[in-house]
Amino acid sequence: MAINKDVEIVGFDLGHGETAVALALLSATVEPQILDVYGTRSILTAVAQHPTRGVLIGDDAVMARNVSNLRIAFKSPDLERLDVHEPLTLFVRKVVDILLQDRKITGGDTTLFFVGCPSGWSEIVRLRYAELLRHGGMTQVTVLPESRAALVYARDSGYISQDLAEGAILIVDIGSSTTDFTAVQHLEIRLSDFGQNALGGGLLDKAILERTVMTHPRQAELQQIFAEYPVYAAICELECRKVKEMYFSNPDMWRETPASRSVRLETSPPLYVDIAITPQGMNELLMTPLLQLQGRSWYTTFREALAHAKNRMGEEQPQLVLLTGGASRMAFTADLCAEVFTEARIVRGAEPEFAIARGLASAGRVELKTIAFREEVELLLTSGKLRQTVEERLPALMSGVASFLAQGLADHTVLPAFRDWQTGRIRTLAELEQTIQPRAVAWLESAEGRQALAQVVTVWFAGLLPSVEKLTDPICDTYRIPHASLSVPPFLNMTHVAPVPGGMVDMGSMTFLGALGNVVTLLGSVIIAKILGGGGTALLMHGPLGFLIGLVIGLVTLSLGKGIMIDWLKGVELPTMARGLISESRVKTALVEQRSEFEQKIREALMNNLPAFDDLLDSSAESITSALHKAADKAVLLIR
């Protein structure tokens, strides 16, 4: 999927109390911008119908006269209810129309909407919600959990620093209707479906209104007006919200004079509703039992929710608690977080009321880029280029192995066997000839042999990885992520490459080369398995190794005099004095002199049997492919 520079990503945070809209371009990485609607960046989630002006939203819906059916607080999972889906559709359609008319968005195929929902909403509710949003004018819409948006916002805004990225983080999103908790570990959501679906700042709005009505001098009349004209009740509740926000913007400011507003209801005669909050009054409200919270207070319920989150996180307690959502501006929420999470840093996001909208736009952009990124990675992995890269480097590996065998077999197999013959532990040259093969097998299978071969494979593998990275670097550049994020990790699952002789791979000694030893030790074991070919030196016995054995026997024969029949001499048990006629240093010198020829014969034997290594090629490519798949899973967390 190619990145279309013209695609607009709209993050639409339809809140219970307020709504915010953010815009991001698919081709960019900058922070999404908050779009204003009718000059305001935070839109009151309210909708009404006017006899001449049609559908009104936000403050316009509240302030206009002669409106009918003023609806507020209509975000709910109960989408089948008329008082939920009707105002929701009207509100969304109006916001989209305004954005189109003001040319804030283009619309059509180039505008993609990403709308948030509480993490606790079921998949069925989300599908129904998306359907309603499409009816509201969002032709291309995706519903994302707000927990995902909160995580992306926290990452992109810099609240999750590099030193915190590996630790646990708790994001607390306090909205008007719900409080959602998102536990993050290694930049991935670990827990997101816990919180308080009924605990939101809107409950305090209702509590303030209820107390205002109960203390009003014309209480009965006011209750009757609200019953007959719900629009007035909605207006007063919204004013209660504004007074609450006024109070929490600076609680100390209202110690002597209460935060207050007055509402004039256009009744005959007019009725005034005075809404006032003092520190004492707010403290009483916070501790008042609420029916919506099963008789518990807002303060107590929030603290219990924090304690529940702490318990759910278990041993992985957060290093950072990030507060988002407009209701997080209530300072006591951060104080309670500090009481419960004593070891964590407590941070309230800048402009918390816009966090989810920005997070939705960023998450949408990341999701689309991630799809394109995975498609490009998959295209590379299925192209055969990885296998071709390994195949091109195989001759270099065979040369390294040939050099290793030429020296190793001479030093660790032939010379020790010669010493044993010279001292009489091996009776005849025929026995010496017969013992070379099992000694070669034993040395190649030993820890010493494997470790020596691993040094060779290390050099080869180190030369292979840059060739692989040349294939992946262009993809990293396209998506602006570090090259190292899409590279082969130090461990590959190579055990399935070929049958490895039992006991050959000692998992306890696989760290002798550091992390890379995990790969090269297994690769070395596979190479040894191929060389031994069913327990014998199948690739070497008849050619290279036979050449080396013949060299030693020939030296012994020459030391005893010309004309001696080699076949006869092989079966003779020579006296110790005769065996001493040829020194170990002479044999060692001859082996060194013939090493290049021996190495060439081994290289030819290996290269002539390259088809035997086909499954090594295939499985090496498959293992690198699997490793890159895993790297891609982590790399997507870096896409912005």
Stretch-by-stretch model annotation:
Residues A61-R65, L203-D335, Q388-D477, I481-A484, ...:
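Gly/charged contiguous loops adjacent to phosphate- or pyrophosphate-bearing nucleotide/cofactor binding elements
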Residues A46, E146-G158, D205-A207, V347-G384:
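Glycine-rich phosphate-binding/hydrolytic loop that grips phosphoryl groups
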Residues F114-V125, E315-C337, E353, P490-T495, ...:
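Glycine-rich phosphate-binding loops at beta-strand->alpha-helix junctions
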Residues Y129-Y159, D163-A168, L204-D205:
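Hydrophobic, small-residue-rich alpha-helical packing segments that form membrane-like cores
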Residues S27-G136, A207-I208, M214-T257:
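Phosphate-binding loop and its immediate beta->loop->alpha context
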Residues A2-P32, G158-L191, L360:
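Gly/Thr-rich phosphate-binding beta-strand-loop-beta motif of the actin/hexokinase/Hsp70
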Residues H16, Q219-F226, P230-V231, R358-V526, ...:
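Acidic, glycine/GT-rich loop-and beta-edge segments that sit at the periphery of enzyme/chaperone cores
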Residues A2, L88-T106, S147-I160, L285-P318, ...:
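Phosphate/ATP-binding catalytic cores across multiple sugar-kinase/actin-like superfamilies
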